[in-house]
Amino acid sequence: MKIGFLSRWGATCGVGMHAEILAREFIRMGHEVVVFAPTEESASKEVKYYKRTEAQDPEFVKREIYTEVDNVTEEGWVKEEEILKENLDLLIIETFWRVPVKPLTRLIEKLKIPVISVFHEANIFKAREVVKLPCDKIVVFDRRFYDEILEFYEIPREKVEVISYPVMKPYDAEPERPVSEDKFLFFSFGRQPVEEYCDFLNALKKLRKRFDNVHYWIIRSDGRVDYEAEWITQWQKRPTVEKLYSYLKGSNVHLLPKGNTPNVVVSSTLYQIIASETPIVIRDSRFVETIETDVYGFGPIVKYRNIHDLVHKLELLMLDRELVEDIKKEVRVFVEKYGGDKIAQEFLDLAKTITK
């Protein structure tokens, strides 16, 4: 089977990461994959979310195939011939508010194959145009996307399929850390706003009063956090996923910065790296509300409610090895349930139900 993706690739965003996880699983299963990526100029206009990583493109990625637009003042374009000549059996569109709806609609009308839209949009306002794409099926990561967005636009329920965001397979990477083994190392990475590091800095400074071996390692793509201390190491990089696994395996706890939002969201970062089994601590918010934990916030991840709750839970992770092992067991169950191989098969099964 020859499967095409219309998507970002090699960037720090959940849209491109979803395509990367699925594409690599399809290839492992023996299918051929072609990725049609946007022009660098148009994608990089979304400064907040689009940052290229240090990874090199594989041969199956074709860039400069379409433009990202705002769909209100711009129509954009798609190089139809570049896609049509591939003779695809299935096209998966990673859909969010910047895909060019009008030229894509014209392309879809010419394709005589199943077309699946993976719906990434987070609220009804940004979804206004992209819900018009004439795809055969719309995949959402959980029921919230239908209940809070697609139903608003009267999209038929039978057109919508719930398929979880996939968990990336773990990399067999050697642990790396910037400090000695006697330090208890907390780690954060990404492009989140600096304000979302406040809880972690606050909590760790409190913990330092009891534990002088606490160290915090921060890697950001958009500059340093404006706070310096001898117990903090900061790097400005956009490492590959394989390198991230080295850093995670060298760390004791992963502090994942996510703020509050009213939008319908998932944390693609979490699904990208949870298989490392380094305990993830994250604010209890809409990003993780569908991930089940016990009443205390412990499960495959650790959810915290406020600073005091965060300090208490970080202290437990430092002192209670049995708790850490229990979290790792929960992670393995989560990875088995939502692994990329299983999710990829669900997409193939869905495609088989589409008749052309």
UniProtKB/Swiss-Prot annotation:
Mg(2+) is required for maximal activity. Optimum temperature is 95 degrees Celsius. Pfam families: Glyco_transf_4. Keywords: Glycosyltransferase, Magnesium, Transferase. Its cofactor is Mg(2+). GO terms for molecular function: glycosyltransferase activity. The keyword Lyase does not apply. Its EC number is 2.4.1.361. It is an enzyme of class 2 (transferase). It comes from the Bacteria. Belongs to the MDIP synthase family. This is GDP-mannose:di-myo-inositol-1,3'-phosphate beta-1,2-mannosyltransferase.
